[in-house]
């Protein structure tokens, strides 16, 4: 290209479609009256082919060339870490900054006849809620339906939790995934051969006495995590701490909030998937509380299901996982237990291993309020076992007024509507 006025040139790239993050890089040099150079145009949006019109103007604002070449710019693909490369799940661990993606066309681990998600025009993805303070931790959430992937960027500066939701064209949530922003959990091998993560699902630390070790709460058979707190709640104040400790995306805030709902109309799998922030409760004829009007015993199982909340390679534990936590309050078959009255919890000891189980309470089966955090400290950890209305969990309790440690129970019975912690076990 040559011209009479070659200094102070301005290059503008205008894509035919609206793409954010375009940059123009110019490298050039003068040779006599000629001005030679190269123009690189790079877009940072989802990879696509886009027609680009290049306009060159001189320092007086006049077109430098009467012709405007039309180029086809092929955006270089963003290198994103595929969290689902080793398998899919309802939870993915994020331990460092970077660009990420995961399979959006599969529910959970893909098991079962209803695990596939049909991605359609008009669908979109965005974060639903995040731990308060993590609003800037997750960004650039988008769905690439053609690739069947959801993309996002993690800043890597904070610890906590987030949920990404996939919504249809009408804004209804189709499915959602939990992002667990935590240092990579340590794997703890018990004497019975079971390998468990060293923290509750959703916990961002393991220090005894720290609320970072509390983790999230789950109703039996649901994949959806519920935020907790450090103090008991009444029925009237249920989810006050969840609302305080998290932020709901304004894009969803008109239709989604932490709350309790009951009744047959909302007690279905479909409603639960579409309302991840709703704590569901349905009282059966026998007085047993379930979040389903028609209870199912196969939502969690010995073989991991598409409703299991654990990360890739892990599942909700079998009920015999804690059998070695025997009747003896002080010493177990494969190790010892130490109750910490100031930090409220038990440390499982086996050789050089230490595994902290906090008494982080639970969410009540009817109104969803936090309990077990006052005069009696309790810890509840779900197993995957259910037979009829009998559901097993690992249970710890300490009556603070007397200092009496109530016997740890490796297979305590409970209702599915309760919100308990989960300690994930390797498949």
What are these regions (language model features)?
Residues 59-67, 170-175:
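Short, exposed coil/turn segments at beta-strand boundaries within extracellular/luminal domains
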Residues 2-9, 19:
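Extracellular acidic loop/turn motifs
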Residues 39, 47-59, 158-169:
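A short beta-strand micro-motif common to beta-rich folds, especially ectodomain repeats
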Residues 163, 203, 277, 282-427:
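C-terminal, surface-exposed recognition/capping segments
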Residues 67-73:
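Terminal edge beta-strands and adjacent linker/stalk segments
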Residues 30, 34-47, 145-159:
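Extracellular/luminal low-complexity segments enriched in Ser/Thr/Pro
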Residues 76-304, 387, 416-427:
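Short, compositionally biased
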